[in-house]
Amino acid sequence: VSVTIRSEGLFSNGEGSGVIFTRKDAKGNQVNFVWTAGHVIDNLRKERESLVGGSKKTVVEFKDPMIIKEIRQDGRTVGRLQMDAEVLKYSDSEDGHDLALLRVRKFNFVKDSVVFHLDKDIPRLGTDLLHVGSLLGQMGANSMTDGIYSQHGRILKRINKRVFDQTTVTAFPGSSGGGVYLKDDAKYIGMLVRGAGEGFNLVVPVRRMKEYCLKHKIMWALDPKIKMPDEETVSKMPIESSPSDKKKAEDDKEKAEAKKMFPFRLRVYEKYPSKPDESIKKLPYQKK
């Protein structure tokens, strides 16, 4: 259920991880949604001004990211599936939840689906966990690491008052957006988004994803028991909701301090010069 997310922006390319959640629509088509970290696709975001009723309105748009799934047979890689996806919801890493919900544009891309841990009980500290992600942009391939649940939501409330959990699973460039799972039943308990050193990585817990989904009325993107809306309803959903300027100003100081403590977003990216040079095709991968 793990995939690579490839984001090709104007001045940079990036790669991270994601997880597929599959539903059937009213016509019986397999619809593949992908959860990833907001900062994995933030280079695809752009704004434009439009006139609505004589007033200026800022319209937020996203270029399609690419979803890459490796196909394996008898322990060998035999090919890759690549498909464009549209961005349905986005919450940025600085002022929001650092979450993004994508939808693969083609029906029946894959049949696999993640199962979210939606129980009210939070797994105990010391619980064995697994992380699956795309190491250094493996382009669809997955690497697995293990660790434990090392702390519940007291960590990093300083970043926009958001709750993170902590884990010792090994993370790497490309881990951002990848799932963290219970080792005993493989249920998804959170999304890896930040790191501050070896064995000290931060997870957006699934309970916070649930809070986000309830607020934006998209619990159908987590819970298969909830009916999916029709296409017209989905197409009218706003991609993002931004905090007020006042709130952003109040949070600036706390965010600056938190960045010093937890500096690493676990995304792989290629950065291009501000003035493109045809003789330079790619620059080396760097951590963002």
Predicted region positions:
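Active-site region of chymotrypsin-like
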Residues: 1-7, 14-16, 105-115, 141-222, ...
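Glycine-biased strand-turn-strand hairpin within the trypsin-fold
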Residues: 1-35, 40-55, 226-243, 264-276, ...
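Extracytoplasmic
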Residues: 13-16, 29-35, 55, 63, ...
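Short, conserved beta-turn/loop elements at beta-strand boundaries and strand-helix junctions
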Residues: 23-25, 92-95, 152-158
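Catalytic-histidine neighborhood of serine endopeptidases
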Residues: 23-92, 207
